[in-house]
Amino acid sequence: MISKPDKNKLRQKRHRRVRGKLSGTADRPRLNVFRSNTGIYAQVIDDVAGVTLASASTLDKEVSKGTKTEQAVAVGKLVAERANAKGISEVVFDRGGYLYHGRVKALADAARENGLKF
């Protein structure tokens, strides 16, 4: 019987490969995206210091309504606002091994519209 590939393991493998080449600094931190079946999470991370500078997710009260794509747009807007409040305008986008499509793209577009450059 042919075994079916585990999509999450393949995603984690892609993410590890990309993370070897991608790093966030204090000047240009990394915007990391994690997507689950029920929600989406975004963090602005300074990898040099190992500190999360700003974050937003569907667990926040402002975001919990709407479809998954609408929630991703709201998370992108919220993380951009929180990053701008801390003086962060440029980031490196880390899609977390996910395709740049759907909820990940919606979050990225919303973050760009609200002032983050990447």
Swiss-Prot record:
InterPro entries listed in its UniProt record: Ribosomal_uL18_bac-type, Ribosomal_uL18_bac/euk
Superkingdom of the organism of origin: Bacteria
Pfam families, per the entry: Ribosomal_L18p
GO molecular function: 5S rRNA binding; structural constituent of ribosome
Keyword Ribonucleoprotein: yes
Alphabetically ordered keywords of this record: Ribonucleoprotein, Ribosomal protein, RNA-binding, rRNA-binding
Biased composition range(s): Basic residues: 10-20
CDD domains listed in its UniProt record: Ribosomal_L18_L5e (cd00432)
GO CC term (a single one): cytosolic large ribosomal subunit
Region of interest called Disordered, as start-end residue ranges on this chain: 1-25
GO biological process: translation
Role of this protein: This is one of the proteins that bind and probably mediate the attachment of the 5S RNA into the large ribosomal subunit, where it forms part of the central protuberance.
Family to which this protein belongs: Belongs to the universal ribosomal protein uL18 family.
Oligomeric and partner information: Part of the 50S ribosomal subunit; part of the 5S rRNA/L5/L18/L25 subcomplex. Contacts the 5S and 23S rRNAs.
Name of the molecule in the record: Large ribosomal subunit protein uL18
Native organism: Streptococcus pneumoniae serotype 2 (strain D39 / NCTC 7466)
Gene: rplR
